[in-house]
Amino acid sequence: RFFGGDLMVAVGGTMVKHYKELAYMGFIPVLLHLRTIFANMKRCKEDIVAWQPDVVILVDYPGFNLSIAKFLRAKTHIPVYYYISPKIWAWKEYRIKNIKRDVDELFSILPFEVEFFEDKHHYPIHYVGNPTVDEVTLFRAEHPETFDGFVRENNLDSKPIIALLAGSRKQEIKDNLPHMIR
């Protein structure tokens, strides 16, 4: 049972809410959808309490999930595991106190986060590998000609190659890409 996306649907279980109905980027979209955000938060909390799982695994999305973790710690005895740790090393580092208080186990896909959480904040974290890196490594092993061919075909042998990463969500790309390509 989960609030999630297409990949979670593919492996089974019951989807309560698709993440596309939960994620809003930017000040104005969040403001315009505040009622929906709070309704989704309430529904999630009620669903967890009604279902009483043995553990809740939160995945990424700290704006929503840290609130769920806080609720679970205050109102239930359900253990909270957090996969893809909040990027507090990039911003909102103060959230470490909430993580320490509300999260039982933290799992990271970035190896440097182990040192950040354990050495700097004395909070244990499990590095579990990075599925994106694994996929890229596998793809490149199966298709070694792809990148080399691209470089050769576009005469980029001696030129720097720049990755333009506008975001992972449609709204981020829509908002960021026009500014990035100027």
What positions do the PLM features span?
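Charged active-site motifs of nucleotide-sugar-dependent glycosyltransferases
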Residues: 156-163
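Active-site and donor-binding regions of nucleotide-sugar-utilizing enzymes
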Residues: 1-151, 165-172, 176
